[in-house]
Amino acid sequence: MATASGASDLSGSGAPPPGVGAQAAAAAEEEEREVVRVRVKKCESFLPPEFRSFAVDPQITSLDVLQHILIRAFDLSGKKNFGISYLGRDRLGQEVYLSLLSDWDLSTAFATASKPYLQLRVDIRPSEDSPLLEDWDIISPKDVIGSDVLLAEKRSSLTTAALPFTQSILTQVGRTLSKVQQVLSWSYGEDVKPFKPPLSDAEFHTYLNHEGQLSRPEELRLRIYHGGVEPSLRKVVWRYLLNVYPDGLTGRERMDYMKRKSREYEQLKSEWAQRANPEDLEFIRSTVLKDVLRTDRAHPYYAGPEDGPHLRALHDLLTTYAVTHPQVSYCQGMSDLASPILAVMDHEGHAFVCFCGIMKRLAANFHPDGRAMATKFAHLKLLLRHADPDFYQYLQEAGADDLFFCYRWLLLELKREFAFDDALRMLEVTWSSLPPDPPEHEVELVGPPSQVADAGFGGHRGWPVRQRHMLRPAGGGGSTFEDAVDHLATASQGPGGGGRLLRQASLDGLQQLRDNMGSRRDPLVQLPHPAALISSKSLSEPLLNSPDPLLSSFSHPDSPSSSSPPSTQEASPTGDMAVGSPLMQEVGSPKDPGKSLPPVPPMGLPPPQEFGRGNPFMLFLCLAILLEHRDHIMRNGLDYNELAMHFDRLVRKHHLGRVLRRARALFADYLQSEVWDSEEGAEATAAS
């Protein structure tokens, strides 16, 4: 509407507006691409062919959904094996049927062979030819997952007593996934609609009572889990998702609360000099600034000069957090967590309050002992092993089953894996999968003081060695984290060269770590925190897949260590992992990529309240991304370095719709099946 007058002026002069024709053509093509017409021919032995026609939305149709449609369309009922191919052209331009083996193949088919319609062929194979679509059994929406069946099921006491919110998610997810079946009724003239539109302002008010109090917090989260939130409403709703408000506040009380907390933030911001000595404060500020200047600069909110108000607000927010939370301080990656919050809140004080809310849950990710990250790695391995034993075995044989290339995913909860606007939706959906956890009184903006004594750590008075950050020199003895790195150093000097962490594609920070391992470390040199294993050179790159050195004790269970018992299969080199723990059995020493490994037996998964340290859906998002690329990885035989480079190239490029849809289906399958082993969770928690 804003350009209407300009357009009329141009048309009045007799000259068409520049680029209007191209824009109109692009818009028409985009509109046409919203629906792809599909014609399918089923061929089975000597039986006459059968035909079906329907329409799909290419943005929300994955290969899994297409398989489900075809099973229902031809009444295959999962009892027969079949292959899918589409009519395309080979390199010589000849028409030929090309196999559909992955989502990438399907995207290619949509892009190159869908005019005037996509021609598919389904070839029914005899049942003895191959096993029956094992992956489909894992990732497909189940017909029996409908809410009427779920409500009639006999639920375990664990689920009923401890997981009422999870049970609600299960029921609601069942209703949503069953809508996949409605695709069969789509006709050429109908619009393809998403499962749920984003939450609107009008609908949000239905979750509030007449005094403005949130009366249905669980239902609100379930609604957001299905469809996200309208961008204009995020500023309001995210404060609930990040557990900023105490329970029961009215609308007026919420406004007064945020004003008071903002004033508290401004007071804390003015106390930097009182809370940190000049040398440490300058180091914190320079470290934060280095990251801020490389965080989401392509987004309009953070574009512009380096001294712009939004970059300055992000810098001050993170510096204040580091100064007021000495046990956590600042680590690289925190700017990625704060950036979307500030962009949505558009208010420095409000963003700081929300950042404190999310860091209450995520601060452990940045702890120098690495235990939280170790647990998440172990749980992701458990999940992948359970969901796709063949793919897990492939990664074992490739020496990549440590999943260290997923480090960035787990540390930042996948924030960098999607385009900025998609990441906002992914984050709110993930947060909504967690039960409400409002503060009892109010969000604490100041963390506990450091418990580290002055003597023996070489830090300044009242300032712990942790607060000195990253590669900053510091004196004193070793810590749990340093002991773990010592163990890695010992293991990496064993037969066969470097340990599993020391990959050719390692970061410069890991190269420095490798150099330090060549001889006894200088006790005055502080080793980098796992989130800081990135050199200044790589700061302009995506947060690469830096492994947590503590996990070296998982990766080398048979390696000698000065603090570990004599090496046996049952012994735990970390000293705090249970003997015979399945987690220890999962993470072994480096494998010979050329040596075939025995099949991996199935195993249970921790219950939701333990899985992923209480955030199980995030693990299923990671699993969905892995499975999206499974076929490509296995077909091309990617090794560890190639895997890491493959996913680094996909930073901010993953397809959110496909990943969310697959993750929800996998998550619903996990919740319904109750393949839970509390001992697994207990052992993982103890190990972490």
Swiss-Prot record:
One of its GO terms (biological process) is autophagy. One of its GO terms (molecular function) is GTPase activator activity. One of its GO terms (cellular component) is cytoplasmic vesicle. SMART domains: TBC. Residues 228-434 form the Rab-GAP TBC domain. The modification Phosphothreonine is found at residue 160. Interacts (via N-terminus) with MAP1LC3B, GABARAP and GABARAPL2. This is TBC1 domain family member 25. The lineage of its organism: Eukaryota, Metazoa, Chordata, Craniata, Vertebrata.
